[in-house]
């Protein structure tokens, strides 16, 4: 793509993500006039004007959309793309907040071919994921959850699974639930994830080393993995692309003991 549309819901995550993307794209030689940035309120459902603007913007050069639209609001956006005759081959969309749960029970035809970036997809074929899905299906059946057999697993579920297991391991190691003690014990903890990767909490910044997986939306509401990193990527707490944060340090070991510092505390 030569032009980029950064479209998101108006809150801190999309604005921070797009701030990083702006700096990144400009570092790759993308001109300011070739970046369109737009925000919508939570629950927004009328994308007619926005899609028309995107269509006009894309007329000059090949264009891609990075969507940080929150959850369910993605559906009317994709539908409007279809209404205006725009397919994934015309203007591909990569979303950071669309997963199996958002697609469950809706017509995915207008969404087929578009992309999503996560750390996990239900379609990942690993023994760990097979066991994870089996346990989830048994839980759904036992508790008679709405949707029954159509219930899905998704990235936030895997993230929760990893987080709880890591916390439990840290509590066992610390021998207490005291926050400070657990914080010291949790750095360096590892968990074998449903995605098949061994996930590690960084010993210093306490962010997770995780893989990046890009999936293409299918008609059945699942994703076909089209690209993934070879392994987990070391987490960076602060973006090197934003000048005001590039010198910040997140380090929970002595003498820093801080998540937002430019000099050590001790």
Q: Where in the sequence are the language-model features?
A:
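Extracellular/periplasmic Venus flytrap/periplasmic-binding protein
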Residues: 1-84, 123-127, 131
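Ligand-binding clamshell of periplasmic/extracellular solute-binding protein-like
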Residues: 66-75, 94-103, 124, 160-161
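Venus flytrap/periplasmic-binding-protein-like
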Residues: 86-111, 183-192
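Rossmann-fold dehydrogenase core element
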Residues: 108-120
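C-terminal substrate-binding/catalytic core of Rossmann-like NAD(P)-dependent dehydrogenases/reductases
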Residues: 125-143
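Segments of small-molecule ligand-sensing domains
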Residues: 141-157, 164-244, 263-266
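A short, charged
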Residues: 245-266
């Amino acid at each position: 793509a030569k032009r980029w549309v950064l479209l998101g819901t108006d809150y801190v995550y999309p604005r921070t993500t797009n701030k990083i993307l702006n700096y990144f794209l400009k570092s790759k030689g993308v001109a300011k006039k070739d970046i369109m940035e737009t925000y919508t309120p939570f629950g927004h459902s009328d994308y007619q004007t926005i899609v028309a603007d995107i269509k006009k913007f894309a007329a000059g050069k090949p264009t891609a959309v990075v969507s940080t639209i929150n959850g369910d609001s993605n559906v009317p956006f994709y539908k409007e793309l279809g209404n205006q005759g725009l397919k994934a081959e015309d203007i591909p969309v990569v979303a950071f907040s669309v997963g199996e749960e958002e697609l469950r029970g809706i017509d995915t035809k207008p969404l087929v071919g578009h992309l999503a970036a996560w750390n996990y997809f239900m379609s990942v074929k690993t023994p760990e994921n097979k066991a994870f899905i089996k346990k989830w299906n048994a839980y759904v059946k036992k508790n008679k959850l709405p949707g029954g057999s159509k219930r899905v697993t998704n990235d936030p579920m895997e993230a929760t699974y990893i987080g709880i297991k890591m916390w439990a391991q840290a509590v066992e190691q610390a021998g207490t639930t005291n926050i400070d003690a657990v914080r010291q014990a949790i750095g360096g903890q590892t968990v074998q994830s449903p995605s098949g990767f061994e996930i590690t909490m960084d010993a210093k910044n306490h962010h997770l080393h995780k893989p990046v997986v890009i999936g293409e939306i299918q008609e059945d509401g699942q994703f076909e993995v089209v690209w993934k990193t070879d392994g987990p990527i070391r987490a960076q707490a602060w973006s090197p692309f934003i000048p005001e944060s590039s010198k910040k340090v997140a380090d929970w070991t002595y003498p820093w003991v801080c998540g937002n510092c430019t000099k050590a505390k001790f």
